[in-house]
Amino acid sequence: MESQSKKSSALKTLSSLWNGSSSATSDPVTVLDRSRTHHHRGRSTSSKAQPFRLDDSVYSDQPPKDHISLARSITRPESASESKIYAPSARSSLSLEAVVGKKVSAKFAKYLSQTDDDWGVSNIKASKSLPRMARSTTPNSSSRSLFPQNGVDTTTSRQKLHSSGRFPLPAKLAHRSVEVEVAESNALVSRIKKFSRILDAPIVDLNALRTLAWNGIPSEHRPIVWKYLLGYLPCNASRREVTLKRKRDEYNAAKDSCFNTNTEPPPLDQTIWRQIVLDVPRTNPSILLYQNPLTQRMLERILYVWASRHPASGYVQGISDLVTPFIQVFLSEYIGDKDPMTYDIALLDETNRNDIEADAYWCLSKLLDGIQDNYIHAQPGIRRQVNNLRELTLRIDEPLVKHLQMEGVDFLQFSFRWMNCLLMRELSISNIIRMWDTYMAEGVQGFSEFHLYVCAAFLVKWSSELQKMEFQDILIFLQSIPTKDWSTKDIEILLSEAFLWKSLYSGAGAHLKR
């Protein structure tokens, strides 16, 4: 009944927009979509927590100064798999036809037909009197032509009704239209050209690069873009080669001083070395690249040199995980289209391997400079992050936090690893690399502050499942969260939700206030 009343209200809004107030917005469906944005993916609809009122600025088409625009990807589904969040029930769709009937105006009937895909009801057979609308050639565009093309239905990949007579929610279609594939290919080419224009400039516009990188970096540009975003390379083109050579030589000298010596290292160094040697073989054991002896020796040297040059923290378990995305990304710069995860690094000459090792060391150092409190004695940075995660989650999903407290689950028991390893044990390395594109685009706070909001969105995603579990099941679930089949799209949705929470709560510790 509640869904039918919401649908009736939505129809009244649509009717009023069509008959006289449509000039208020260029896309009336967006108004309805905004009213439904509190149904985030993974959130329990039965939660009693009151949703927060969002500022219009959060949903405007103009991006924040320091971020790429996420409003369109947040307020409207971009694919068939996402549109199920917004799809009404079959019963409400059928009642729609009964109410409208023959009395509906021709214009409004056409409008309903043109928006059927946005509401996820494209699989409902339309009345013969209503012409079908032609899709826009842009895959994610909400606009439709108001007239059929020669009376022929140009909409492709329509789902057939289930044999049971029900109207299933849209699923990923087995066959995609040629138009969509061509449009996506053109969009990728256009995006690559935008990166190339920025990177080929005499002085790289770092703000423009961050804005563009927020939504992901093409694999062919990722190695150099990461180096810019982390501050490893200077923006001035005339200084790049000189700086790169100097930094690589500096690392090689530090490496030689640590490993090419006839004197016995002090006991503390031996302790660090033994721990590193134990941890490296356990790093990404299922990926061939990291089981290669040459890669393992590379990891050992990077970790030991970093620990020796940062005595306040030394080596802490978990840092070994943070090196691997850099090695994988920088390796891809030398092997073309081959898969870095299965590539035999022995095929590279020693000079290229040394360059990859040096670049990975310096980028790891830049990353850890922003979160070094996580790895000093007693790891106060991680404990502070865990406490902030608890308070933030309490604001977002109070029933979930109360359930965890009632079951005796402490946030430290499961989220310590999230902060220590930056979710690398919870997500595949390919998804981590995509997530790091956004972290680096966020700037110096990407791996600390923004990561906190990603962890909150990640936890709240499983709220409905967790609230049905008891203590032991909760801990088992949170130690092995089912993300094996996650794609890049899942990561982008997670990042979008984290951006929303950050827009609401960042600054002045707002999320800590009750």
From Swiss-Prot:
GO terms for biological process: vesicle-mediated transport. Residues 18-28, 135-158 have a biased composition (Polar residues). Residues 216-443 form the Rab-GAP TBC domain. One of its GO terms (molecular function) is GTPase activator activity. Gene3D superfamilies: putative rabgap domain of human tbc1 domain family member 14 like domains, Ypt/Rab-GAP domain of gyp1p, domain 1, Ypt/Rab-GAP domain of gyp1p, domain 3. Its main location: Golgi. GO terms for cellular component: cytoplasm; cytosol; Golgi apparatus; Golgi stack; nucleus. Pfam families: RabGAP-TBC (PF00566). Residues 17-65, 130-164 are annotated as: Disordered. It is found in: Golgi apparatus, Golgi stack; Cytoplasm; Nucleus. Keywords: Cytoplasm, Golgi apparatus, GTPase activation, Nucleus. Stimulates specifically the GTPase activity of ypt1. Functions on the Golgi as a negative regulator of ypt1. This is GTPase-activating protein gyp1.
